[in-house]
Amino acid sequence: MKAVIAIDSFKGSLSSFEAGNSAAEGIRRVYPDAQIEVRPLADGGEGTVEALTLGCAGQLTTVTVTGPLGKPVSCQYGIVDSTRTAIIEMSGAAGITLVPDTERNPLYTTTYGVGEVIRDAITKGCRHFIVGIGGSATNDGGAGMLQALGFGLLDKNGNPVPFGAMGLEVLDKITTDNVLPELKDCTFRIACDVTNTLCGEQGCSAIFGPQKGATPAMILQMDKWLAYYATLAREIFPHANPKAAGSGAAGGLGFAFMTFLNGTLESGIKIVLEETRLSDYIKDADIVVTGEGRLDGQTVMGKAPIGVAKIAKQFDKPVLAFSGCVTKDATACNREGIDAFFPVLRNVVSLEDAMNPVNARQNMADTAEQVFRTIRSEEHTSELQSHSFISYAVFCLKK
């Protein structure tokens, strides 16, 4: 029996590989000789660097960069030497989790550190970039990142504008004289599932500004500044489009990537599934196991487990899902390729106990064991004509 396991991380508890290896442990208790492939999974958000880097046989590295508040932070990113690819999460350098609640103010938070990570990767030989841009603390339109890469964002006196959205208030000119020359040879794939525009009622300031600490007055100001920033950008890059879907992602970082770096915005799960070649592993599997920390109605909206299920169904494979929490509307997942799903919690516990990594690993392994015991039992008792999921799975295992 061959099982392919691709489970997204249980945020704050288990990484993708930890969750997958725990499920594999449970399966091996029942099928000691099973061939099990544990593959990394992420959707472009938290855990993408580790999942993609390890899934592509790369190495993790760490660099100290300027954090969102202007203070040094340590940022981990991945390098795949064979393809000269860097895998980056902007949240590692400019994420909202790096800013205490009492200090959240998008007028001053910067993406400068994101540019420093890119610059570091370029010096290490990378020319291809995969960047996840979720979880930002910023609303500077990517201005800080561009400054770190050599773009001149200048005020009327020719001085660099200050960090943060506040710098856009005094922005008068954008120059490209000192841009890193290597950038012309670089490609950028941006993992982004946000469709908001740069400005307007559905723009980054209005929609995401409040959670970053913006007041209503700040939102109006930042929206106006970003609009003028886009106008200046269009003078140099005619393709600049502040109305493009995703241009408002990460406080306008999406706009900066598309406009200044010719980046393409793509579904996060699409990038991960392609880069890790998951379909190559699933095509000759007998059963596929996926999951995430919380399985609910939103899972069907482009989340990682559904991406796995869709690939599995291309090859007519049965799909199981394990999750820390399962809501009533998770049944929507059954219509999108997940044949059956199971919560791994065995009793009512506190959130702290449920997320404890030791408990989570044990719960995952124990649940997987019991589910696969049922499958093994059905091998001896079920008729192949039965229409139950378990019999369907057994039938596939016997093929």
Feature-to-residue mapping (PLM):
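N-terminal loops that bind phosphate or other acidic moieties
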Residues: 1-133, 137-377
